[in-house]
Every structure is written in structure tokens, then in C-alpha cells.
Amino acid sequence: MKKIFYIISAFLLFAVACEPNNTTDETPVVGATSLTYAVESIADHEAVIVKPEDLEEGAPVVIVLAEDLELRPLSSPVEETPNVNFKAAEHCLIGRYALCVIATSSNDDLAFLTDAKALFPGTSKFYLLSYRNGLSYTAAMQMPDAFAAYGCVSGEIDVNTYKTNNFTKPVSFVHVHATGNAVCKWNGVQNKTVSVPLCVGAIAAVNECVTFKETDLLPREGKGRVSCTHYLGSESGCDVKLYSVEGTNGGWCDEEFEVYNQIWNFFKTH
């Protein structure tokens, strides 16, 4: 398989997200580090693999399903790197994981995920995140044992897909969504897409979560309130988190709330 490798040195300042209890177990990271990029073709899907240059063997892999491979790190001074404008590309330096971002469409057959995982022999754990689509929900229904945890950022699931599939096994899932999102509606669109609370609630029900906890992150001056509903108590050990951001946009990557840090904090506990 043809690969094109790029290594960039970037001086990055990372904002660390605030935990729901207003405390953090990490400190901001400032320094020089390197990312490696590999351009791949996975079952006719374009993909970019991003990872720290010195990543440990067997480190976790986060597979991201996105309709556009906009992956250029904003801090990258190197024009020759792949088109990587996706904040998670930089966050993998904090989390110490490999990131495999695959170009997809909302109606794709997800069988290619098996080929994607085969690129990382010896990997300890795989996680799946869908970005601006609901494919992680589809995967959680069709292949609940394939990933240690699932996540979704600003995505929605088609009504017909929801009706023709079922959540059959407990899964751990995290979803982040702006309540006023104009593209992927929080409450769904009648006969087209399913509401975010319904999707999250369906997983919590299959997990048989017996309790939930609601918390707010630190206030964000001039920005929408960020709250977290955590469904837990399942005998399976699987839990569900829903981060809701008031307003029409997330304002994800500010000092008070860095979305991919929250997602990784969830993933790494599973």
C-alpha cells in the first residue's frame, strides 16, 4: 500500500479541559513535539493516520469517521502536510494515542472498519468517534463488540437507519452537541433524523443504567453553558455521557472546554 510520510515539528500550547467537578488531573502542556502523518487507502476510503513520532508500541487507536478530511493542524508551519484541520490531530499528543481519520459518507457500509483495525496489529484498544455524522451510533448497533467505547461530535442518525437497526448489547458512549446546531438538529428533524436525547437514552436503556448525574463545567464567559449528563450504574460497566452546549455553535476549543480532552478522558477509562 502506498504511503506518504510527513514529520513536522510544532510548538503547541494545549488547553486542558475542566472536569465536571471543577478540578483537573492534568496541567497545560507547552513544548516542542513531532507528529507523523501517513496517507492511506482503506477499502476505497481515503484516510490519514496521525500519531506522535515516539508513540509506544501497542498504544490505543482512535478511529474518526468524517465526511471531509480537514485535518491540517492550525499550528503547522509546513504546507506539505496533509490537509489536517481537525483539533483531535493535535490532541493525540496529549492522550498518547494514534488517530486514524477516514473519509466517509453517512450511508457507508461500515465493513471497512475491520480493514482499518487491521492496519494496527498489536493495538491494545480501539475507540470510534464520528464527527458531524451519526456513524458511531450505527457501529454501536451493528458491531457493539468492535470498539472499547464510541463517541460522536455534532452528529445525527438517519431515522431509517435507526428503525432498521437496534442497540442489542451494552456499549460505552459519549456525545457532544450544541443545542442550537443548525445542521445536525438537537431535537432531530421529523421523518429524517433522530433527536440526540433519544439516541443517548436508547443506549442508556440497553445498558440498563440505573442512575444519572448532571453537572456543569466551569462557566464560559460570553459563551453557552456546557453541562454533562452521565448515565451509570449498569452491571455491564458501560456508561453514557452527553455533553450539551447551549447555543448555535460549540466554541469547542477554548480554555474552559476542549472537547477532545473530554472525549479522551471518557475513552481512556474503558
Identify the residue ranges that each predicted region occupies:
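C-terminal catalytic histidine-bearing segment of alpha/beta-hydrolase fold enzymes
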Residues: 173-176, 203-270
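A domain-start/cap signature at the N-terminus of enzymes
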Residues: 18-61, 97, 126, 131-151, ...
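Acidic beta-to-alpha connecting loop that harbors the catalytic carboxylate
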Residues: 68, 178-182, 189, 246-249
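Hydrophobic h-region of N-terminal signal peptides that target proteins for export
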Residues: 10-17
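Active-site nucleophile loop of the alpha/beta-hydrolase fold
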Residues: 104, 151-159, 178-182
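Conserved alpha/beta-hydrolase "acid-adjacent" motif
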Residues: 182-196, 254-255
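Active-site machinery of serine-nucleophile hydrolases
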Residues: 59-62, 67-119, 226-231, 236-245
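Sec-dependent signal peptide recognition
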Residues: 2-9
